[in-house]
A protein has these predicted regions:
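Helix-to-loop junction immediately C-terminal to a conserved catalytic motif
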Residues: 49
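Q-loop/switch helix immediately C-terminal to the Walker
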Residues: 72, 79-92
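Catalytic Walker B motif of ABC-type/P-loop ATPase nucleotide-binding domains
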Residues: 144-148
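Conserved ABC ATPase "signature" region
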Residues: 86, 90, 98-115
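Hydrophobic anchor residue at the start of the ABC signature
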Residues: 133
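The feature captures the beta-strand-to-loop junction immediately N-terminal to the Walker
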Residues: 34-36
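A short, flexible loop at the N-terminus of ABC-type nucleotide-binding domains that lies
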Residues: 1-20
């Protein structure tokens, strides 16, 4: 999939929200979209997902199946959660037993099966969000676009969504996401798209900086020792940054490599 000189504005006399966006969206890639509030991230995601058309430029090669989770799910639809998902399954060509398996499977994985008989209008924000996520994942999409999809979810559902993202990427799907938490899927993104205030988008390779919250035990009046373990696409770079930090001494370090990540780095520092 590719964006060529893509721009979007809402009216010919309105300012450009995003403009001049040229980027590839390769299969099997995880892309984090970053930017300040109001910078145009949601608009860009809608264009990528095909929810709204670009005002200029071209989007080519979009996968036939695309899943999209909006920042705000329209919970007032006249369906129960299960009715809505069965309807969306039919829209995606999943009928009969195939549709039933997908609907019930995602309801179970997201912890929503016991509430799916409720009307969407009576559901909590978190439960509506689970319905939005389930509908996006029903067709096993080749393109998955997530706009603050983790907001309002309980811990188990957040973990289920993390797993679903990893599965889509492993199966060759492309995933783009926005999330206010800088630690969301930390170290896993293949690229970052930074949306500037002028509507321009800068494409950066790599996962970017990783923030790891830790509890540090104090073992002396001036010295603190802590063991940090994390998964990252570039474990060597993380260790180099630790060694370069003022006031930090790396006592020991090890790197384990796996097929799913660039490395698992463990370090004891003081």
């Amino acid at each position: 999939m590719r964006l060529d000189s893509v721009g979007k504005r809402y009216g010919v006399r309105q300012p450009w929200v995003v403009r001049g966006v040229s980027a590839d969206v390769p299969a099997g890639r995880l892309i984090r979209v970053e930017g300040r509030n109001g910078s145009g991230k949601s608009t860009l995601l809608r264009v990528v997902a095909g929810i709204t058309a670009a005002s200029e430029g071209r989007v080519t090669g979009r996968p036939a199946s695309a899943g999209y989770v909006p920042e705000r799910f329209p919970g007032g639809l006249p369906f129960s959660g299960r009715e809505y998902l069965r309807h969306m399954a039919r829209v995606h060509g999943l009928r009969g037993a195939a549709g039933y398996r997908q609907v019930e499977g995602w309801l179970e994985r997201l912890g929503a099966a016991g509430y799916a008989g409720q009307s969407l209008g009576s559901m909590s924000k978190g439960m509506c969000q689970k319905m939005a996520i389930a509908q996006a994942l029903l067709p096993s999409p080749g393109l998955l676009v997530l706009d603050e999809a983790w907001t309002g979810l309980d811990t188990a559902a957040r973990e289920a969504l993390d797993e679903a993202v990893a599965e889509r990427v492993a199966d060759g799907g492309a995933v783009l996401f926005v999330d206010h938490d800088p630690a969301r899927l930390a170290g896993r993104a293949d690229e970052r798209w930074q949306v500037g205030g002028d509507g321009a988008v800068t494409v950066l390779a790599g996962p970017g900086p990783v923030t790891v919250p830790v509890t540090v035990p104090r073992i002396g009046p001036r010295v603190q020792r802590v063991t940090v373990r994390l998964e990252t696409l570039d474990a060597g770079a993380v260790l180099s940054r630790l060694r370069a930090m003022d006031g930090v001494r790396v006592l020991s370090a090890d790197v384990e490599h796996s097929d799913s990540a660039g490395g698992s780095a463990g370090a004891e520092v003081s």
